[in-house]
Structure formats: structure tokens, C-alpha cells
Design a protein with these regions (language model features):
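Ferredoxin-like iron-sulfur electron-transfer modules
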Residues: 2-26, 34-54, 72-78, 184-206, ...
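Hydrophobic or amphipathic alpha-helical targeting/insertion segments
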Residues: 58-62, 67, 165, 349, ...
Length: 392
């Protein structure tokens, strides 16, 4: 981990360059987690890394560019755009665009060819991390249309990310208007919701017991479940705990994940990783590279969405090991997801796997993007253990 941190020049994934910081304290006001504060003794802005959840709202807000951020900084995003000549740039939050199929439907695109030729697409953990300079460069300098797809403000996984983006968009529209420029900036908000099939419901109330928002409840007479879609955050926990498969989550449907596992198993994969898309950023952008190592990563909306049946299927079909990557409980973006993964998924799995002497082939790891190298470290450690078990 020290080598990785030294390579990037970060102790963690974020730091403040005090040499250019003006201590305007805009970052302090913008931070949703009270992770940045002004130190009266040192007269510097300081990041409390334990509170920080790597939303990068501070990075996008800083007028002096004094906050250095490891993931998706302005330069790396602009470099990515240079590789595409598509006339439209789409930047979407991972939280509401789970798949290319979903993105095509949202954009009204009929084929992958049409999508790739007309749109350059980028999925970010939160669109609120975009700096205003990016939008100015894309619209004015490059003459492209920008489509921004944040979550609805009340459903932002980073609390104020969507709000921060909309403030920038409103500011830029006013400036462009005063300059007589007609910018092509379109905002399409959205949020994932579960799909409920009442004809399958057993009325067992598992969904009600595990739902972190109170959106799922059992009503009488029936009994049958009912969902308040106004407060559903699309974590998918109810889909994982439902024994009748009466609930599904768009983009992460049970059958689609099952089909993906079957496809992966035919490629002689050593290790399958179910990775919460909020607890690791870099690896989810380099999934293809991992395949060369015999590792396949399936991004998940939350670690709580991991279904024990999918884990058992992976082992049954010949995959040597399964790893679940989750946020630390206190940092879960969906309230109870990490706890569900640990106490529901793992406990149920251990009951079955211990009978088959396979419990050592499934592991759960808690990490965060702020801890540089931890994901790779845990992955390689488990892969080594799997190879040793296979050898004996």
C-alpha cells in the first residue's frame, strides 16, 4: 500500500495543497459529511479521512483547484473525451444508470452502434464531482452537447452531489445567457426503483424486515407486500432476501446476474468478485484488465444486493472462489447494505457452505476508495489462498 500511495503522491485518495489554498472555506461548506475543517493553529484546511466518503464535492467546488483528488479529476476526464469524436457527451451517476441497456433506453437509442457513434458516455460515482470547467470546455471549446444524468436530489448517495451539480448548471446557464451563448446542456434526473411481482409474494415480510428506508411493508388482508416507491432508493436488498423472487431491481435482475455467472464460469475464471460500486472506483473502470488474471468483477448497486443463491451457483459451476466487496458499515451509501451482506448473506451462506466444506472459498471484505491499494491487496491475498486450496 505504501508503494501505491507513494506512486500517486497521496497518503489517501484526497489531499489539500496548502501552497495554493486560499482558505476560503467553500469546501467546508460544501462537504456533506463535515470532513473538511479549518485548523486555527495551522491556519490550513484539513481533511478528516475517517469522515470523508470520497464524493469529491469539495474538489468540484474549490475555486483554486487546491484539492487534489485521485479519481476522475478534470485532467483524466478531459483526456478520456479526447479519445472520442462523438458529438454528444453523457456523464451519468452509477446510481441511476446500471447498464448500457438502461442507458440506451433513457437516451432513446435503438442500437449499440448508434450509442457509440453519437455518444461518449462516462459513469461516475457522483456527477456532483464535475467541475464547471469541464462543462465550459465541452460546450464552448469543443462544441459538443452535454447530457448530465444525476440522481434525484433526495436520493443522492452522497447527500449533496446532485444539488452541487445543479447549482453549477444554473450558474453556467446564467453566464452563457449574458454572453449570448446558447449552451447545449441537458439534465435528465433519475433514480432506480425495484419491480414488484405481487403474484409471487408469499407475505413472509423478509423485505419489510431488511428494507433500510421503510419502503417495503406487508399489508393485510393478504398478507402481501407493498412498496412505497416514493422512498425506495433502489438498493436491491429486498430482492436479495426475497425467497420467492417476487422483487427485482432494474439492471440487476436475478436472472440476468445468474446468466452472467454462467457465462463467466465457461471462461475458467478463478475468482468472482461482487463489488459494491460505492466502495471501489478504480477497479470498476478496469474490469477487462482483471480478466487477464482470471478475475471477473460484477459491479453491484450495494453489497446487500448479493444473493446467496448467486454465490452458490458460482461455486457449483466451477468458479474457485467468490469475494464480496462492501463499504464499511458506517459508510454504506444505502444505510443497511453492508450489514445485510455481513449478517444475512454471509450467515446464510456459511450454514450451507460449511456442510460442503466450501466456507473458505467465500470471503467478504470491507473497504473504501479512500484507502489506496486496499482493494488490490485483499484481492491478491484471497486469490493466493484460493490457488493454494486448489493445489491441495
Amino acid at each position: 500500500m505504501d508503494a501505491v500511495a507513494s506512486l500517486w503522491g497521496y497518503e489517501y485518495g484526497i489531499e489539500v495543497n496548502s501552497d495554493i489554498c486560499a482558505t476560503c472555506r467553500m469546501c467546508e461548506k460544501a462537504c456533506p459529511f463535515n470532513a473538511i475543517s479549518y485548523n486555527e493553529k495551522t491556519e490550513r484546511m484539513e481533511v478528516d479521512i475517517e469522515r470523508c466518503q470520497m464524493c469529491a464535492v469539495c474538489y468540484s467546488t474549490c475555486p483554486a483547484s487546491a484539492i487534489q483528488y485521485l479519481y476522475y479529476d478534470l485532467a483524466s476526464i478531459e483526456n478520456s473525451i479526447e479519445l472520442s469524436s462523438a458529438p454528444m457527451i453523457v456523464v451519468a451517476c452509477r446510481g441511476n444508470v446500471p447498464s448500457e441497456e438502461n442507458l440506451m433506453r433513457r437516451l432513446g437509442v435503438r442500437s449499440e452502434e448508434e450509442l457509440h457513434s453519437n455518444y461518449f458516455t462516462m459513469l461516475l460515482p457522483c456527477v456532483g464531482r464535475l467541475r464547471a470547467e469541464f462543462i465550459i470546455d465541452a460546450v464552448v471549446s469543443r462544441g459538443r452537447k452535454v447530457v448530465l444524468m444525476p440522481c434525484e436530489e433526495d436520493f443522492c448517495r452522497f447527500v449533496r452531489g446532485s444539488e452541487a451539480l445543479m447549482k453549477k448548471v444554473q450558474m453556467l446557464r446564467r453566464i452563457f445567457s449574458e454572453l449570448g451563448i446558447s449552451p447545449e446542456i441537458e439534465v435528465r434526473r433519475g433514480v432506480l426503483k425495484v419491480e414488484f411481482k405481487p403474484y409471487r409474494c408469499l407475505g413472509c415480510a423478509e423485505c419489510q424486515a431488511f428494507c433500510p428506508t421503510g419502503a417495503a411493508r406487508v399489508i393485510h388482508p393478504g398478507p402481501v407486500a407493498d412498496f412505497d416507491m416514493d422512498i425506495c432508493k433502489g438498493c436491491g436488498i429486498c430482492a436479495a432476501v426475497c425467497p420467492a423472487h417476487a422483487v427485482d431491481l432494474k439492471g440487476w435482475e436475478f436472472d440476468k446476474i445468474s446468466a452472467k455467472i454462467h457465462e463467466i464460469s465457461e471462461k475458467k475464471v478463478k475468482l468472482l468478485v461482487f463489488c459494491c460500486q460505492w466502495c471501489e472506483f478504480g477497479a470498476l473502470d478496469r474490469i477487462a484488465e482483471r480478466r487477464e488474471e482470471g478475475i471477473e468483477i460484477i459491479p453491484m448497486p450495494c453489497s446487500g444486493r448479493v444473493d446467496p443463491l448467486h454465490v452458490i451457483q458460482a461455486l457449483y459451476e466451477g468458479i474457485k472462489g467468490v469475494m464480496i466487496i462492501a463499504c464499511p458499515e458506517e459508510e454504506c451509501k444505502l444505510d443497511e447494505g453492508s450489514k445485510t451482506a455481513l449478517y444475512f448473506t454471509m450467515e446464510r451462506l456459511n450454514e450451507t457452505l460449511s456442510q460442503l466444506n466450501l466456507e473458505k472459498r467465500v470471503r467478504i471484505c470491507f473497504t473504501s476508495p479512500k484507502y489506496i491499494g486496499r482493494f488490490d491487496e485483499e484481492l491478491q491475498k484471497f486469490l493466493k489462498d484460493i490457488e493454494e486450496m486448489s493445489a491441495t
